[in-house]
């Protein structure tokens, strides 16, 4: 297995979270590199996209495929790229060892969403059910994989 790289992105609205998750990633001592993307790091064709004018999703997440693709291009084959949302929290636990071992055999590691997330009501959602947060085609795609 090659290098292990963690990447995250945030605009000004989530700048504190980006800094926090970068610190958490470094403190884990697992990643060879921690790459924190901001709008200034994006290629011009993404920065100039009309979608980037919207606050929602930092520009309706138009940046996400670009951030992942650009990072993949910068590293050698066999590098493990771990994309995380800047708003999540990285726990310091033994799971990281397990996940690293799994990545030696599989190209992709996905995590199952739990329907009941007690603290989500503070975000104003009337429901934490995944159907309210995810496109139907995405749900159907991953249902076929299980």
Task: Identify the role of each PLM range.
Residues 1-146:
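Glycosyltransferase catalytic domains, chiefly GT-A lineage
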């Amino acid at each position: 297995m090659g290098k292990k790289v963690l990447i995250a992105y945030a605009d000004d609205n989530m700048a504190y979270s980006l800094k926090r998750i970068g610190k958490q990633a470094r403190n884990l001592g697992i990643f060879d590199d921690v790459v924190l993307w901001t709008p200034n790091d994006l290629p011009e064709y993404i920065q100039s996209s009309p979608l980037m004018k919207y606050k929602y999703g930092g520009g309706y997440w138009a940046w996400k495929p670009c951030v992942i693709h650009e990072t993949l291009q910068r590293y050698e084959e066999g590098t493990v790229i771990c994309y995380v949302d800047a708003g999540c929290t990285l726990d310091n636990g033994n799971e990281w060892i397990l996940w690293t071992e799994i990545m030696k055999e599989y190209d992709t590691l996905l995590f199952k969403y739990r329907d009941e997330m007690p603290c989500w009501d503070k975000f104003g959602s009337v429901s934490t059910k995944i159907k309210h947060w995810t496109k139907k085609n995405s749900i159907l795609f991953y249902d076929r994989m299980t």
